[in-house]
Amino acid sequence: EMTSSLVGSEMCIRDRSSTVDFVFSAVDMTKDEIKAIEEAYAKTETPVVSNNSAHRWTKDVPMVVPEINAAHFDLIKTQKERLGTTRGFIAVKPNCSIQSYTPALAAWKEFGPKEVVVTTYQAISGAGKTFKDWPEMIENIIPYIGGEEEKSEKEPLRVLGTLENGEIKLAEEPKITCQCLRVPVLNGHTAAVFI
């Protein structure tokens, strides 16, 4: 079914939420629109698992890689109080490029790494493109992806952080420096990580 027919009025959200157990959210909208639609679903008692970046820094929304920070799910209690829900909530996943190396950082955490240098090689699917849509990428590399470096340096610190007093305290170390390149690969990101 076309997603455009699923997105729209508040009535549509109420109607759809009564027919589903939960919602996977991966939409191409502004951050404000995404926040509004995800909260609307949560307020209808429908759990939302989001691929979008809109709620990644909302204080009571857990950004989870379950193998690393399942304790962050406890934030959902605080979020439900804010939303006035018993079942509905929002949880997000981190940026796709950090999922490949954050588990390795977590494994090294006990050794106290001070600095991490990462270079990501990101497929065009990460930009929502195919080679048909973006023929200029065939045999081409883009050496800078706007906004990706900042996300790749900050989001792991939230994932590796600790839950304290109902919010996430960011990990203070390691210091992460990242360079993000777009490469002529359809699917799959790669990261070179130096700890």
Name these PLM-found stretches.
Residues V23, V48, V193:
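Receiver (REC) domain switch-region micro-motif
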Residues D28-T30, A54-H55, N95-S97:
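Short glycine-rich anion-binding loops that position phosphate/pyrophosphate groups of nucleotides
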Residues S18, T85-R87, Q99-I195:
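Active-site-lining helix/loop region of Rossmann-like oxidoreductase modules
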Residues M2-I13:
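Single conserved hydrophobic/aromatic residue that forms the stacking wall/gate
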Residues E10, D21, E45-T46, G88:
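Conserved acidic residues
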Residues V65-F111:
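Catalytic helix-loop patch of NAD(P)-dependent Rossmann-fold dehydrogenases
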